[in-house]
Amino acid sequence: MEEDGGGGAGWGWATWRVAAVAAAAAVWVTMHVAARMADALWWRPRRLEAHFAAQGVRGPPYRFLLGSVREMVALMAEASSKPMSPPTSHNALPRVLAFYHYWRKIYGHRFLIWFGPTPRLTVAEPELIREIFLTRADAFDRYEAHPVVRQLEGDGLVSLHGDKWALHRRVLTDAFYPDNLNRLIPHVGKSVAALAAKWGAMAEAGGSGEVEVDVAEWFQAVTEEAITRATFGRSYDDGRVVFAMQGQLMAFASEAFRKVLVPGYRFLPTKKNRLSWRLDREIRRSLMRLIGRRSDEAEQGEKADDGSFRDLLGLMINAGAAAATRGNAGGEKNSPAAAIPVEDMLEECKTFFFAGKQTTTNLLTWATVLLAMHPDWQERARREVFDVCGAGELPSKEHLPKLKTLGMIMNETLRLYPPAVATIRRAKVDVQLSDGCMIPRDMELLVPIMAIHHDTRYWGPDASQFNPARFANGASKAAKHPLAFIPFGLGSRMCVGQNLARLEAKLTMAILLQRFEIRTSPNYVHAPTVLMLLYPQYGAPLIFRPLSSHPPDSTGP
């Protein structure tokens, strides 16, 4: 009995000790987590403010948890509540990047802002941008985008890092060489000509001899055609079905992006979130079937006819087929023979759909709006198109390089209304820039592309005016500094698809100028705004009147 009682007491004592240790551990973990949270949400921001203040860099004060977000949201909301004034002004920076424009006037071109507890240092000097993107690029990397942003743009080339990024970039670059892109010109040209014929028929049916269309909506079909062919090549029909679903998914993700400040919103089983999840599963199943079919063809040695377009999906699959054939002989790290996993192929298809479609759509939209606003430049560009291409012939690969005026107009469009108004880099190590500024590791740098493009220090007093003539001697000589024009980024991470965007935009505008006079509609409200990319807040309704000199049934070969 005593032994039993003693055993019970011993067992109780042991249980108490375990409970005490567990409680102490729980308290320690709680205190440790609390200390880390306090450091991340309060003490680290204070240290960084002091660090940069000692270097003469200031900014709006950090507020617990929210940082500068409340002020930023208020400034952006106020700016977007009214259109541009005057309505033909191109001084869009105060509207598009209202927080940057406001705080720059107070703190100068370099200041510290807080996206919650995450600090970002603004850098707008071309020489420092050269360091960040070129001469010291190994010290910086792309920042980690928000999960909702990654859902929109995919975990493809845009968001990859290190060796994986290098492999994908090497494999995919082949698709965007000019010789390969030229093979798309007939396909894109016929698509644009069909669109023009539809607008011509609408103008005739309307009785007024002209038609109003929202080009921000209509151009999406043209750019989707091009990016589908670039991504899927001979599997175009299958790819078109997949990208139709991807377009719906983008619409849902865009709505979720607007609610990005609501914690956990993307996980809530709302009706649209459930539809989004279902679409994502179906897209993945469809792409898996397509990749499997194309992979089987690659294994059997089936290839497209010589001289056909080298599409993105084919390049990724062929890289894997080459790896299987060669057995990764020699074990070359990240050689093109290294296979790209199927999951990565899925993400690349999503990335190129978003980046390729939206970037080119926005470039085309703003270029058309600008030509409608500036009929003198529209007429100059039209005369050039007629001189080079004639009135009825679809522009060819031989024609496009000769359209110099149109090229100048595209560059000026990209300067005034760049697709991405800012870009962000993260310091991988502690870095001292050439001007002495010390950047701590993990610090994010915000490069305001639009602000640089509108800066009178580099572009002169007419920086906010539409003047394509500034690009008469090329982009590198258009400003006082060659790196004051970076619409597609800079360095090794420059947009891989920029050649496709430029080619498609130039070809589309040439065909439309052959066929229409373009005017702004009374319904057009000039209100550029940003949601990831720059776009017209209220659409872009323009009036197209068919040119009487153009044969109504001529849509090219």
Curated annotation (Swiss-Prot):
GO biological process, one term: brassinosteroid metabolic process
TM spans (from-to): 13-35
InterPro entries: Cyt_P450, Cyt_P450_CS, Cyt_P450_E_grp-I, Cyt_P450_sf, Cytochrome_P450_Monooxygen
Known tissue expression: Expressed in roots, shoot apex, leaf sheaths and leaf blades.
Family the entry assigns: Belongs to the cytochrome P450 family.
CDD domains listed in its UniProt record: CYP734 (cd20639)
Membrane topology classification: Single-pass membrane protein
Subcellular localization: Membrane
Native organism taxonomy: Eukaryota, Viridiplantae, Streptophyta, Embryophyta, Tracheophyta
Role according to the record: Cytochrome P450 involved in brassinosteroids (BRs) inactivation and regulation of BRs homeostasis. Is a multifunctional and multisubstrate enzyme that controls the endogenous bioactive BR content both by direct inactivation of castasterone (CS) and by decreasing the levels of BR precursors. Catalyzes the oxidation of carbon 22 hydroxylated BR intermediates to produce C26 oxidized metabolites.
Entry keyword annotation includes Ubl conjugation: no
Any further remark recorded for this protein: Plants overexpressing CYP734A2 show a dwarf phenotype, characterized by abnormal leaves with stiff, tortuous blades, undeveloped leaf sheaths, no flowering and bear seeds. Over-expression of CYP734A2 causes an important reduction of the levels of the BRs castasterone (CS), 6-deoxocastasterone (6-deoxoCS) and 6-deoxotyphasterol (6-deoxoTY).
EC number(s) on file: 1.14.-.-
Binding site residues for heme: C495
Residue ranges that the Swiss-Prot or TrEMBL entry lists as coiled coil: none
Cofactor(s) the protein requires to work: heme
Chain's gene name: CYP734A2
MF annotations from Gene Ontology: heme binding; iron ion binding; monooxygenase activity; oxidoreductase activity, acting on paired donors, with incorporation or reduction of molecular oxygen
Protein name: Cytochrome P450 734A2
Principal place of residence: membrane
Up-regulation conditions: By brassinolide (BL) and dark treatment.
GO terms under cellular component: membrane
Superkingdom, taxonomy of origin: Eukaryota
